[in-house]
């Protein structure tokens, strides 16, 4: 398993769709998504998600979008594009962002017959249609992917090998959900997850030389190899010597590159990642503490418990009772 896939797996990435929106120029709204905005029945889809990433898939027309407070960082998006808001910041969308914004939550209309929430708002000008959805993450504040993404992330689904499939499937499933057809929400949930993974991969591929951060580490061959090894075999009793030998670098060269790109030494990264996997196991499985300790590479339950309490301020059993 590659490192990106492993990080997203542990984060319990989930997706869904909650709104069909239709706007007519001139218009401007301010919005941030919360669980209360998601369509009925999507609570189970969210699962243990503690963080939501809204996205907007544009079907027709174009508009501007920016994160509130980020003046001068407007994006113009049009048909076939998806814009994601990785930190779920309050963001402005509209035909003209200089207009006084209306709160998105004030213009949402409730779903009918098990379909989507809907919005119809604006003047008498050009129409813009979009589908709004979300990605749910568990423990996003500790997730190395989320922390390195920009405030706004744009994906053009017209580009890439799967463009036609993504576009046609998304539009078909959205139409099915809008009329309350059973099973279509599941299709859109999985497609939402695919869109996010594709957006992250394309963003990582387009990073400029000299960029730092976890995603930039995936572009440096030796660091990417080290990350893949650590994620693939988390239970191994890794040492810096072992890892440097596997990736074909000296200890010092690997440590320098890893720290420059990832921000901390390889063994510190591994220790942090083991704790993230531990929280996932504690929250979503019935595995014993001894079993979890073995899975993530600790020699004993006691050693695992000490490390966990140091990281989170509570013993694993206590944490499980509070977060299960």
Q: What is the role of each PLM region?
A:
Residues 131-228:
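An amphipathic alpha-helical interaction segment
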Residues 78-79, 86:
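Residue-level recognition of short, solvent-exposed, well-ordered loop/turn junctions
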Residues 58, 230-233, 282:
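Short helix-to-turn junction characteristic of helix-turn-helix DNA-binding domains
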């Amino acid at each position: 398993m590659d490192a990106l896939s492993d990080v997203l797996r542990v984060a319990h990435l989930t997706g869904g769709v909650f709104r069909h929106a239709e706007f007519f120029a001139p218009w401007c709204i301010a919005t941030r998504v919360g669980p209360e905005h998601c369509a009925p029945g999507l609570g189970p889809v969210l699962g243990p998600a503690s963080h939501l990433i809204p996205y907007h898939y544009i079907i027709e027309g174009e508009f501007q979008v920016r994160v509130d407070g980020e003046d001068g960082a407007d994006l113009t998006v049009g048909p076939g594009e998806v814009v994601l808001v990785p930190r779920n910041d309050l963001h402005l969308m509209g035909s003209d962002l200089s207009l006084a914004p209306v709160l998105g939550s004030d213009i949402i209309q409730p779903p009918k017959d098990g379909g989507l929430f809907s919005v119809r708002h604006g003047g008498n000008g050009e129409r813009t249609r979009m589908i709004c959805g979300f990605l749910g993450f568990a423990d996003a504040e500790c997730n190395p992917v989320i922390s390195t993404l920009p405030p706004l992330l744009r994906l053009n689904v017209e580009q890439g090998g799967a463009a036609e499939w993504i576009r046609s499937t998304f539009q078909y499933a959205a139409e099915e959900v809008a009329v309350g057809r059973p099973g279509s929400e599941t299709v859109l949930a999985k497609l939402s997850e695919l869109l996010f993974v594709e957006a992250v991969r394309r963003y990582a591929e387009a990073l400029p030389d000299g960029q730092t951060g976890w995603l930039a580490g995936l572009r440096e061959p030796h660091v990417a190899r080290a990350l893949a090894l650590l994620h693939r075999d988390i239970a191994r009793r890794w040492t810096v010597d072992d890892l440097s030998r596997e990736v074909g670098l000296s200890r010092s060269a690997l440590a320098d590159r890893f720290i420059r790109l990832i921000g901390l030494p390889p063994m510190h990264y591994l220790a942090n990642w083991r704790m993230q996997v531990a929280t996932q196991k504690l929250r979503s499985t019935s595995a014993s503490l001894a079993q979890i300790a073995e899975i993530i590479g600790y020699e004993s339950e006691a050693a695992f418990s000490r490390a966990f309490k140091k990281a989170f301020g509570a013993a694993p059993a206590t944490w499980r009772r509070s977060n299960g």
